[in-house]
Amino acid sequence: MVIKAQSPAGFAEEYIIESIWNNRFPPGSILPAERELSELIGVTRTTLREVLQRLARDGWLTIQHGKPTKINNFWETSGLNILETLARLDHDSVPQLIDNLLAVRTNIAAIFIRTALRHNPEKVRDVLTQSSAVDDSAEAFAQLDYNVFRGLAFASGNPIYGLILNGLKGLYIRVGRYYFSNPEARKLAVNFYGRLEALRSEELYDQVMDVVRHYGKESGAIWHSMQSAIPRDIAEVRR
């Protein structure tokens, strides 16, 4: 991983995360002492302390007063907010990471969309109406698709689904910009939104899960056809 951070704090954060990822600081081990680590990275101890607190909040570290800082197994202790970081750390793992992301989206969407249509049809109509005025561009569709799934998640009445989508937002939209550069992907999405609106208006709630899963398979096929040309900077934050 090439560290591109613009600030001392950003550099220190990326250095520590990259070191954990590459097992320089393996899970279960103790992080070097503050003075040693600040000299190694080239930042002040005050800056390092702020970075360590942030990494602890994200699940990379465990900080306990009076005890050495411990490296966590981040797969067990971190949340969805580290997905973009993982994608930047290992470009070769991005296709599998995104496959897993899409599978999770399809599985939970089949549940929350059916609930939303059944219990909050007016809100569902409002959410789906967004698709009628979208520009035919990858950027517009990436944002639209995220907004539709997030809107339907909250329309289900269970805010946990919405919080999951919130956690996926960064990587979801970055992947979407590439995926929706394919006109067939944009066409498929519009047809899917239209099908959901038809199910809503006709109250065919029992068909929702099949429709969502079918869309997951079709969109997955398009995605797999595009995987070989994934941009190396797909997970990079636009500055």
Swiss-Prot record:
SUPFAM superfamilies: GntR ligand-binding domain-like, Winged helix' DNA-binding domain. Residues 34-53 bind DNA. One of its GO terms (biological process) is fatty acid metabolic process. Gene3D superfamilies: GntR ligand-binding domain-like, Winged helix-like DNA-binding domain superfamily/Winged helix DNA-binding domain. Keywords: Activator, Cytoplasm, DNA-binding, Fatty acid metabolism, Lipid metabolism, Repressor, Transcription, Transcription regulation. It comes from the Bacteria. GO terms for molecular function: DNA binding; DNA-binding transcription factor activity; fatty-acyl-CoA binding. CDD domains: WHTH_GntR (cd07377). PANTHER family: FATTY ACID METABOLISM REGULATOR PROTEIN, TRANSCRIPTIONAL REGULATOR, GNTR FAMILY. This is Fatty acid metabolism regulator protein. It comes from Pectobacterium atrosepticum (strain SCRI 1043 / ATCC BAA-672).
